[in-house]
Regions:
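Histidine-acidic metal/acid-base catalytic patches
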Residues: 1-2, 29, 99-114, 134-141, ...
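N-terminal pre-domain/capping segments
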Residues: 1-103, 281
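Acidic-and-aromatic substrate-binding clefts and catalytic sites of carbohydrate-active enzymes
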Residues: 10-20, 39-55, 76-80, 125-133, ...
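An acidic, carboxylate-rich microenvironment
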Residues: 20-23, 168, 243
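Active-site acidic/histidine proton-transfer and metal-coordination neighborhood
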Residues: 62-63, 78-180
Length: 281
């Protein structure tokens, strides 16, 4: 199994980012993890890609044994909807703004240090899903034309996102036969109201597309406990890890990624143990 984690790098200072990435690489080496995911936030983009990632940070990435995934513009909170134009926006102008931002990011990293995966979001929902889907497919076609073969993937989203509802996410995968995707377990479990049978149905439905599943973002959740909790915490009515792996997680190419405990090595070891032990059942 391939494992990775998101250390939660933030653009407070360049020195701090370098220190945290170096610590993350050391932790990945200790644990034998294959992938580090970096989140590119709005603030990082506004500061400038070369300002944030150039120099020592890029040197560390180029010299690392680990591969990198880039999580572009995570949907932070519903109050950020006005600032996020989204590649599925029904209006051409804001959609083109987001496409230009994505192309700048892809061009920068493809020229300096290509990512193993670029994880993108559809944006916030402002209209009927069918309207968003048409716009999203236009954007994906444009990106595929500009960057054929570049590894892009879409993910299911938090509440309020275009791809937050299971049926909508499945419809996108059905309509886009070449699209790779990332599955966030905590968000998906929350989307079915922590109903174990509904979650099992969603997993069975996703199994048809398992060969296109690039990454599982592991997080736990339960009623009253939030939707982004560590796996190793015991929660009443929490996520069924074993069922998730058994249904969609056995492909050795899938990256099992942890994003709830930062770069804390002992906690990452517990997260990995929770997945690994469930896979052996």
């Amino acid at each position: 199994m391939r494992f990775g984690f998101n250390p939660g790098l933030e653009a407070h200072t360049k020195r701090e980012m370098v220190f945290r990435l170096r610590s993350a690489l050391q932790g990945a080496h200790e644990l034998g993890f294959d992938v580090i995911e970096i989140s590119l936030t709005e603030r990082m983009f506004e500061l400038g890609l070369r300002t944030v990632f150039g120099g020592e940070l890029l040197d560390l990435m180029q010299g690392a044994r680990q591969r990198f995934h880039l999580h572009l513009f995570p949907l932070a909170a519903p109050d950020g909807r006005q600032a996020d134009p989204g590649i599925s926006n029904p209006s051409p102008y804001p959609r083109s703004i987001q496409l230009r931002r994505l192309t700048q990011v892809v061009e920068f990293f493809e020229a300096s240090h290509p990512m193993q995966l670029y994880l993108i979001h559809a944006g916030w929902r402002t209209a009927a899903f069918e309207t968003h889907l048409r716009s999203l497919r236009r954007s994906l076609d444009a990106l595929d034309t500009l960057y054929p073969g570049v590894p892009l993937a879409l993910t299911n989203d938090r509440p309020g996102g275009v791809l937050s509802q299971p049926n909508d996410f499945l419809e996108l995968l059905e309509a886009s036969p070449n699209l790779r995707f990332v599955f966030n377990t905590g968000l998906a479990y929350h989307a079915v109201d922590y109903n174990a049978e509904a979650y099992a149905w969603l997993l069975r439905s996703l199994a048809r597309f398992e060969e296109r599943l690039a990454e599982i973002q592991w997080s736990n959740g339960a009623p009253g406990e939030g939707l982004n909790r560590p796996l190793h915490l015991s929660l009443e009515r929490g996520l069924d890890i074993h069922r998730t792996i058994r249904t969609i997680g056995r492909n050795p190419a899938i990256v099992h990624l942890f994003g709830t405990v930062g770069g804390h090595v002992p906690a990452l070891a517990r997260e990995r143990r929770a997945v690994y032990n469930s896979a052996r059942l």
